[in-house]
């Protein structure tokens, strides 16, 4: 029995036979509900062609939550930092508000800790939901053309407070 009162709630890596169900949920949420047409597996084939990149939470035999992990190496000579980007966090619409995305993310965090990754980036529009799991906002801004306007105040330092944590990783791993 899970603390949510649901029998047989399990998180783990997506199985190959579950991939169509997961893709249907992700595409429904992030593509079709927004009036888009190019499905995620065509936009992100490297991440979504391997079920090993997808973490799911199952209730009995049904997928109720999922997220995608894209592992990468961040080269900061002389270092090669092992890292991951996490995105496409999804919970079935009828199951929202029960902590299932948190359950899925907690399992993903355990997996990444076992892999001894140096850091991970969580892409979310709701950072407050995940702060209790140890995630901190480290948004460095947007790199894109945009409408310009005069600054309302003098320029300030570009790095947020959390960037010091990233520098600590670099110092710890430097030879």
Predicted region positions:
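Short coil/turn motifs at secondary-structure junctions
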Residues: 72-74, 94, 127
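Conserved active-site alpha-helix within GNAT-family acetyltransferase domains
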Residues: 114-119, 124-144
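A conserved beta-strand-loop-helix scaffold within acyl/acetyltransferase catalytic domains
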Residues: 11-89, 173-175
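Extreme N-terminal starter segment of soluble prokaryotic enzymes
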Residues: 7-9
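Short, positively charged and aromatic/hydrophobic N-terminal segments
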Residues: 2-3
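Amide-forming acyltransferase catalytic core, primarily the GNAT-like/NAT-type
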Residues: 136-175
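Conserved acetyl-CoA-binding loop-helix of GNAT-fold acetyltransferases
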Residues: 88-91, 97-112
């Amino acid at each position: 029995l899970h603390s949510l009162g649901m029998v047989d709630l399990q998180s783990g890596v997506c199985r190959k036979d579950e991939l169509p169900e997961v893709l249907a949920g992700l595409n429904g949420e992030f593509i079709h509900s927004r009036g888009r047409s190019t499905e995620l597996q065509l936009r992100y084939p490297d991440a979504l062609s391997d079920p090993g990149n997808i973490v799911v939470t199952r209730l009995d035999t049904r997928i109720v939550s999922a997220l995608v992990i894209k592992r990468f190496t961040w080269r900061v000579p002389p270092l090669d930092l092992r890292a991951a980007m996490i995105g496409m966090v999804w919970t079935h619409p009828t199951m929202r508000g029960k902590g299932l995305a948190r359950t899925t993310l907690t399992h993903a965090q355990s997996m990444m800790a076992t892999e001894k990754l140096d850091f991970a980036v969580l892409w979310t529009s709701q950072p407050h939901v995940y702060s209790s799991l140890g995630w901190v906002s480290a948004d460095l801004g947007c790199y894109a053309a945009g409408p310009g306007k005069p600054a309302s105040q003098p320029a300030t330092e570009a790095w947020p407070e959390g960037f010091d944590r990233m520098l600590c990783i670099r110092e710890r791993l430097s030879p």
